[in-house]
């Protein structure tokens, strides 16, 4: 009987907001529009960072990687979410769920590490401007970006491998829009303390350590800016890092709220909190990638000029 209860699952049912079917059409339209904006905005940033020689700098190299990450991250979940809104049978295969978990976690981890690298880049640019070309040479910033991707892929491969080996005892209803790793782990009918410990270690290494690097970098940046006597100089120095700081606050604010809430929430109304988790996850998964190009371009003259001259590039010529 015990073996029978642990039958291998072939598919998962994505519950999402199926309890509110009238909202599904509204969510479909909103998420579809946001996804188009994500593709256009981040795609444009990638193009200009490649085609415009003036943007061949470490900062825009990292920004191009960040934009590519946002496109990959949203593409792992949004298309399937849109299909599920229009389909009566909201299912995903076990292998498809595993792939979605792997890609989503890999992209999320890579972005955490990459934001830390970008903070260090801004620290060197503002606090050590004369040594910036030496410290942030191509031999430095390319391995930094590659290391971010490597960390994300390895972390995701390890965690996903352990999760897919868990027994689910025919529990296949995921209370989420997509195969988010925590939502899948909740279905396991075995002790997941090992998985939770592994996730804790990964969170410290790939989320909190980059956050610590960001905090230290910006503490030194703010200290350096305050030493500048002219208000114009302070304003110019702060404008070079304000966009990145805004993105960091939105990204980390959302992710820390999601994954570091106290466990006492289980004693409260679980349905309301599940709905809250899903709404926050949607904000984290859609709003942040959509806002990143806007944040980086609104106060950036170089980006505005590059976008303005983009149609005249040889890339578009016959």
Swiss-Prot record:
**Cellular component per GO, a single term:** nucleoplasm
Q: Which Gene3D superfamilies match?
A: Rhodopsin 7-helix transmembrane proteins
Entry's PROSITE patterns? G_PROTEIN_RECEP_F1_1 (PS00237), G_PROTEIN_RECEP_F1_2 (PS50262)
Topology within the bilayer: Multi-pass membrane protein
List the stretches on the Cytoplasmic face of the membrane. Answer: 47-54, 121-139, 218-237, 299-318
InterPro entries registered for this protein in UniProt = GPCR_Rhodpsn, GPCR_Rhodpsn_7TM, Olfact_rcpt
Question: What's a Gene Ontology MF term here?
Answer: olfactory receptor activity
**Which keywords belong to this entry?**
Cell membrane, Disulfide bond, G-protein coupled receptor, Glycoprotein, Membrane, Olfaction, Receptor, Sensory transduction, Transducer, Transmembrane, Transmembrane helix
Give the UniProt family note: Belongs to the G-protein coupled receptor 1 family.
Under which name does UniProt file this protein?
Olfactory receptor 13C9
Lineage, highest ranks first: Eukaryota, Metazoa, Chordata, Craniata, Vertebrata
